A protein has these predicted regions:
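Substrate-positioning beta->alpha
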Residues: 188, 205-225, 232
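N-terminal Rossmann NAD(P)H-binding glycine-rich loop of SDR-like oxidoreductase domains
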Residues: 6-27
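Glycine/proline-rich active-site loop of Rossmann-fold NAD(P)-dependent oxidoreductases
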Residues: 166-168, 180-191, 224-234, 256-257
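NAD(P)H-binding glycine-rich loop region in Rossmannoid oxidoreductase-like domains
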Residues: 46, 51-98, 106
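Glycine-rich "substrate-gating" loop/helix at the edge of Rossmann-like oxidoreductase active sites
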Residues: 145-146, 176-185, 202-215
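Conserved beta-loop-beta element that borders a ligand/cofactor-binding pocket
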Residues: 157-181
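Conserved Rossmann-fold NAD(P)-dependent oxidoreductase catalytic core, especially the SDR/UDP-sugar
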Residues: 98-147
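Mid/C-terminal beta-alpha module of Rossmann-like enzyme folds, strongest
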Residues: 220-286, 303, 308, 316-340
């Protein structure tokens, strides 16, 4: 890892952010992290903690405080408003799109070595089959689903515009479904796993995605920082999988019975009831029309580019899922006595 750089990680307590931050800290790097919650910082970071700046991605004044010293800086921008539905459109746009623009704006007059924008495979235009080199990935917001997908696409547009108009040394890092230890935020798939273990998930659906281990990105982070080319896009993923496959690995480890699998049309029939339940309880729904659409998408993403340029290798999904469950137990997010 290049220790001559000062690393700035926005969203350093988030799922992706904390895993990458811990990797940098383990390598002895100088890391400055943007966070909003002191309580979460204490929960996420134990022995090693980055220099924390408490602030909001929507405030340029807060973001200016991240640039301590003269650099050179490597910015790893992970902040986004994550939602499996359309979400609060204003907050989605303000955090994910304008927040990215704010980070770009405050970086333009700094000594930036690399600006890594952590994006998502959800930003890929509907129906687009990526080339091996991702040269045909052109963010097209109106060809993505409204909500998180579209917001990430707009954010990608802002980054590429900054590359074109201001020579920002930025690259797009698209991530498929993130799994593995480190999810202190109870993201959607983690909640599905917890509900299954706790007996609150009555059935699975006949669909899948592409889930990979975020630790495998951390392992090649040094090569990403040094070798990612300005203006280019990279995708980290594994192979397409099924929800049943993930849950069966969970079940094998926790001695839980396999769930029945519902056809997709039944899942769609249940949407109004989930929406009503969400409104009554204030809890997020188990799934939405947007998340069901993702389960039907082609997720056979090309990995040749990251394998060749960064030495990336996706570990077996079963190993990732088991380690994910172990993490939940160790952090008391599930009760091990549920299955031991």
């Amino acid at each position: 890892m290049n220790k001559n750089l000062t690393y700035i990680v926005t969203g350093c307590t988030g799922y992706v952010g904390n895993v990458l931050t811990k990797k940098l800290l383990d390598e002895g790097c100088n890391v400055i992290g943007l966070a909003r919650s002191e309580k979460k910082v204490k929960r996420v970071f134990n022995d090693k903690t980055p220099t924390i700046i408490y602030g909001d991605i929507r405030s340029k004044e807060d973001l200016e405080k991240l640039f301590i010293g003269n650099g050179p800086f490597c910015v790893i921008h992970t902040v986004a408003y994550v939602s499996i539905g359309e979400g609060d459109q204003k907050e989605l746009f303000d955090v994910t799109v304008e927040g990215t623009q704010n980070m770009i704006d405050v970086s333009l007059n700094k000594d930036i070595y690399k600006f890594l924008h952590i994006s998502s495979s959800e930003a890929i235009p509907h129906g687009l089959k990526l080339n091996d080199d991702l040269s045909n990935y052109i963010p097209t917001p109106l060809k993505t689903r409204k909500g998180y997908n579209r917001a990430k696409s707009y954010a990608d547009v802002r980054v590429l515009n900054a590359v074109k108009d201001h020579n920002l040394p930025a690259s797009l890092i698209l991530l498929a479904g993130v799994l593995g230890p480190g999810d202190y935020s109870n993201t959607h798939m983690t909640q599905v796993i917890i509900d299954y273990i706790n007996g609150k998930l009555p059935a699975s659906v006949d669909g899948g995605y592409n889930d990979f281990d975020i630790r495998d990105v951390a392992l090649v982070l040094d090569k990403v920082i040094d070798n990612a080319k300005t203006g280019e896009s990279y995708i980290f993923a594994n192979q397409p999988d099924k929800i049943n496959e993930v849950l069966n690995y969970v079940g094998e480890y926790t001695n839980k019975k396999p769930l029945p699998t519902l056809p997709m049309w039944i899942a769609y029939v249940g949407l109004p009831f989930l929406w009503l339940g969400s409104k009554l309880t204030g809890k997020r729904p188990l799934y939405t029309s947007a998340s069901l659409a993702s389960l039907k998408a082609d997720t056979n993403f090309p990995l040749a580019k990251v394998e060749k340029e960064f030495g990336y290798h996706a570990r077996p999904l079963k190993e990732t899922v088991v380690d994910h469950v172990k993490f939940l137990i160790e952090n008391e997010m599930i009760n091990k006595w549920e299955f031991y």
